[in-house]
Amino acid sequence: MAESTTPEVVAYPAGDEPLPVLSEVEVRVLGALVEKQLTTPEYYPLTLNALVNACNQTSSRDPIVSYDEATVTRGLDGLRDKKLAYVFAGAESRVVKFGHKFAERFELGRAEVAVLCVLLLRGPQTPGELRSRTGRMHAFESLPDLEQTIAALAAKQPHPLVTRLPRQTGFKEVRVTHLLGGSVSVSSAEPAPEPPPVDRTMQLDQDVAALRQELAELREQFAAFRKQFE
């Protein structure tokens, strides 16, 4: 699917700078840049080849992708248009490298950047998953400590950067998602309806009937087997 590098924006009241809406490729490229800055700063900024590898790595990524250099370059161009990435050409390096302006653009602290980085690279996460998966970037002392960071991002001005999704059926925790891919529609975020309760007695009766049928079939098969030797 072709990716557009034309900046898309969400409409906000006059006077506010629009929140950029990132494509899937831009989300992955930005997440990879942020992650490598926090976890391996000695190799940051990244060359194009290193950035391609960071986008395509199979660990800590959901979904797993296989971008080529042209795709990643388009993502970089889009991020640069949205003032979220830059080209670095140091005096001691002949190779062009790339960095991000994520924290500066949204005035974020390290804890906030770590949370958003995981959401960019892995999609919606529960608070427990976020605390576990941000460990290399920022060590949250407790789950309440993480919850405070999530709350701060959800109340960020002028535009929230994360939101909580309705609890899924069968899950104890709600999930958190970033809003840099656009706002979450209410209809798609509505929780699935609860399944009707199962009558336990009826279920047991059905299980017993199925076992009896299997036993009858086994008896018939054994009887046929015995006749071969009579």
Swiss-Prot record:
Stored Pfam families: DUF480
InterPro entries referenced in this protein's UniProt entry, alphabetically: DUF480, WH-like_DNA-bd_sf, WH_DNA-bd_sf
Domain of life: Bacteria
Family from the record: Belongs to the UPF0502 family.
Record protein name field: UPF0502 protein Oter_3715
UniProt organism field: Opitutus terrae (strain DSM 11246 / JCM 15787 / PB90-1)
Lineage: Bacteria, Pseudomonadati, Verrucomicrobiota, Opitutia, Opitutales
